[in-house]
């Protein structure tokens, strides 16, 4: 069975179990890291922020061998990379929407969310968001359309849309690159 041999092919190894729970968890954050890094290849510089919705990451990743099938189970959708540009005031609203959802997969961001799902504090790359500054966000097309309770993600000033680069392909490439360098997967890029 060709499909079985393809899906069972080992492409890497994880040193740790990675879950997908709110408000924060390893696997969605790692996927957000991969999106953020991919923006560097596409746009010439790593995005300030990476965002993936918890619903886009469908299952956990167990410690041990990672197969092609595991990656398809984790990322079953054909979501494509989008690199979006926002003013800080809109990025602040996005962070407030994420807080109301009690967290999503994030990269480049530190945030404190209250038990009432209110944003108490946020930093991008270790600094407060400046309303007039311009920020880049690497995410997926589904979220760039303002879906999944984050309408402000659809209010970008500029965008680079890469339908040829799905989040699954990017994550697979990341896992294979790590394996080629004899680096097992940990919870952050």
Task: State the predicted function of each range.
Residues 25, 29-189:
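Feature captures C-terminal
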């Amino acid at each position: 069975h060709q499909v079985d041999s393809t899906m069972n092919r080992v492409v890497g190894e994880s040193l740790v179990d990675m879950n997908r729970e709110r408000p924060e968890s390893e696997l969605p954050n790692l996927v957000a890291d991969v999106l953020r890094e991919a923006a560097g290849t596409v746009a010439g510089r790593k995005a300030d922020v990476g965002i993936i919705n918890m619903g886009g990451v469908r299952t956990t990743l167990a410690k041990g061998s990672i197969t092609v099938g595991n990656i398809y189970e984790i990322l079953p959708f054909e979501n494509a990379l989008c690199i979006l540009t926002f003013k800080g005031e809109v990025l602040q609203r996005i962070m407030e929407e994420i807080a109301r959802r009690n967290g999503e997969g994030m990269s480049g961001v530190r945030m404190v969310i209250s038990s009432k799902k209110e944003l108490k504090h946020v930093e991008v790359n270790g600094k407060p968001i400046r309303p007039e500054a311009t920020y880049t966000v690497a995410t997926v097309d589904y979220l760039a359309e303002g879906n999944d309770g984050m309408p402000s993600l659809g209010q970008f000033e500029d965008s680079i849309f890469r339908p040829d680069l799905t989040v699954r392909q990017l994550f697979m490439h990341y896992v294979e690159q790590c394996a080629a360098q004899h680096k097992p997967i940990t919870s952050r890029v």
